[in-house]
Curated annotation (Swiss-Prot):
One of its GO terms (cellular component) is plasma membrane. Its main location: membrane. The chain crosses the membrane at residues 13-33, 53-73, 80-100, 102-122, 137-157, 164-184, 303-323, 341-361, 370-390, 396-416, 431-451, 460-480. Pfam families: MFS_1. GO terms for biological process: carnitine transmembrane transport; creatine transmembrane transport; urate metabolic process. It catalyses: creatine(in) = creatine(out); (R)-carnitine(in) = (R)-carnitine(out). Extracellular pH-and Na(+)-sensitive low-affinity creatine transporter. Also functions as a pH-independent carnitine efflux transporter. Residues 1-12, 481-508 are cytoplasmic. It comes from Mus musculus (Mouse). This is Monocarboxylate transporter 9. It is found in: Cell membrane. Keywords: Cell membrane, Membrane, Transmembrane, Transmembrane helix. Belongs to the major facilitator superfamily. Monocarboxylate porter (TC 2.A.1.13) family. One of its GO terms (molecular function) is carnitine transmembrane transporter activity.
């Protein structure tokens, strides 16, 4: 199916607005789950590691299921998937208000809401790319800030709703707000297909005889009509078994031919269908082999291999602060009256700023995007190691802002992937990297929570987080250093055969 040329405006700006609010409404609560995390600790009395699974699943499931999400969007379109996912997110949030234990939240909030968010992210990005070409970067940048603005607003909103209506009332109201995703999805008008005439229906006489099982009876109607002219008639007679039926008087040779040709035609068609199924299975197997071969070739690229390790370690260590920072402040005995603004809100607004500014920096030709990404990883690791030394609200707020800004490196990650594998392999490589990012999101907060349950302090937990991010940054830095290319150039070259080739000079 071919779509019209991207309009780069017009209704596309409506798509940008509704995609922004779709990400705002869907990701607002899961990204600001740190406010709910503190309440769940008090409500269910479970360990921090087990409780952290709720928020980590909500963020990681959508990334882990990104191939399935892409399949749904390509099969059904952005509008139906958005409306269906709106029901998933809203229903999951409302079900979470009825949770009797933490295990119920794993399903209702972690899996249902997480899967809905993953579907919505894929749908909004896909339809935005369809409507924009030359302004695609601007459009994607605008809609991606929806999740960061949602984190900023929902952190304060959920805290206020908990004070007035309790935890269950907060989840019910937030779930009701998520129903507005249905209205946003209804405005996602798909691009019309290119103006081309629909194929005409094939006339019965144009269908080859081999596709008709009973072609011997139908291909010569005049012969059938001549039966009456030749004196053959059909009369109602009582058949030998006592049933009444219509007995037709036909020549014996014609009746035998009809009965012998029909099974042969049927067998021929069965053989053709069997061969078609074999060819289809062979083709699918070849596609699977090609996919595995392309995946193996990607991991032969040392920079790509270092990149997947870096993104995995970055999400293991860098994601927990957005979930646990509120509980960190409480564990460091920061007074409630000192929390003038939720730390999660500061984290969210600075993430939006980081996405914008880092994206602008990546467009400068004199800046190497790979080195810029490595710099964000190393500074993030150092900031994580500094959290145990922050014992006041001001220092925690400063570190939250720094970590939020550096988390905005998600906006330059597609640039980094493109520079590593090329534009032709971008979709394949990006899907693999997003899978590992989802794995890191799912594992990071529980690991930090388990460290707290073991040591009763967040100090060792954030030292571990900082070490993971620093390790990933240095691995990627070593992979992209030009000294590796210099070493390869110094390797002895194979002996060149003593055969001379002469090329005729031409003026072409």
């Amino acid at each position: 199916m071919e779509f019209q040329k991207s309009p780069d405006g017009g209704w596309g700006w409506v798509i940008v607005v509704v995609s922004f609010f779709t990400q705002f409404l869907s990701y607002g609560s899961p990204l600001a789950v740190g406010v709910l995390y503190v309440e769940w600790l008090d409500a269910f009395g479970e360990g921090k590691g087990k409780t952290a699974w709720v928020g980590s699943l909500a963020s990681g499931v959508g990334l882990l299921a990104s191939p399935v999400c892409s399949l749904f969007v390509s099969s059904f379109g952005a509008r139906p998937v958005t409306i269906f996912s709106g029901f998933l997110v809203a229903g999951g949030l409302m079900l979470s208000s009825l949770a009797p234990n933490i295990y119920f939240l794993f399903f209702s909030y972690g899996i249902v809401v997480g899967l809905g968010c993953g579907l919505l992210y894929t749908a909004t990005v896909t339809i935005t790319c369809q409507y924009f070409d030359s302004r695609r970067g601007l459009a994607l940048g605008l809609i991606s800030t929806g999740s960061s603005v949602g984190l900023f607003i929902y952190a304060a909103l959920q805290r206020m709703l908990i004070e007035f209506y309790g935890l269950d009332g907060c989840l019910l109201i937030v779930g009701a707000l998520a129903l507005n995703i249905l209205a946003c999805g209804s405005l996602m008008r798909p691009l019309q297909t290119s103006d081309c005439p629909f194929p005409e229906k094939t006339a019965p006489e144009n269908v080859p005889d081999r596709y008709s099982m009973y072609n011997e009876k139908e291909k010569n109607p005049e012969e059938t009509m001549n039966f009456q002219d030749k004196g053959y008639s059909s009369e109602d007679k009582c058949l030998p078994n006592g049933d009444w039926g219509r007995e037709t008087s036909l020549p014996k040779s014609l009746a035998i031919a009809a009965h012998t040709k029909e099974p042969e035609t049927y067998k021929k068609k069965v053989v053709e269908q069997t061969n078609f199924c074999k060819q289809l299975a062979k083709r699918k197997w070849q596609l699977y082999r090609n996919y595995c071969g392309e995946t193996a070739s990607l991991f032969k690229n040392k920079v790509f291999s270092a990149l997947f390790i870096a993104i995995l370690l970055f999400d293991i260590g860098g994601f927990p602060p957005s979930l646990l920072m509120e509980d960190v402040a409480r564990s460091y005995h920061v007074r409630e009256e000192d929390l003038t603004m939720p730390l999660i809100s500061i984290f969210g607004i600075m993430t939006a700023v980081g996405k914008l500014l880092l994206g602008i920096l990546a467009d400068f030709k004199w800046i190497n995007t790979l080195y810029l990404y490595v710099a964000t990883l190393i500074i993030t690791g150092l900031a994580l190691c500094a959290i145990p030394f922050a014992k006041s609200y001001v220092t925690l707020a400063i570190l939250s802002g720094i970590l939020g800004f550096l988390t905005g490196n998600w906006s330059i990650f597609p640039y980094v992937t493109t520079k590593t594998v090329g534009i032709d392999k971008l979709a394949h490589a990006y899907g693999i990297l997003m899978f590992f990012a989802g794995l890191g999101n799912s594992l990071g907060p529980p690991i930090v929570g388990w460290f707290y349950d073991w040591t009763q302090t967040y100090d060792i937990a954030f030292y571990f987080s900082g070490f993971c991010v620093l390790l990933g940054g240095f691995i990627l830095l070593l992979a992209i250093l030009p000294c590796w290319d210099m070493c390869n150039k110094k390797l002895p070259k194979p002996a060149v055969p003593t055969t001379f080739f002469y090329k005729v000079a031409s003026n072409v």
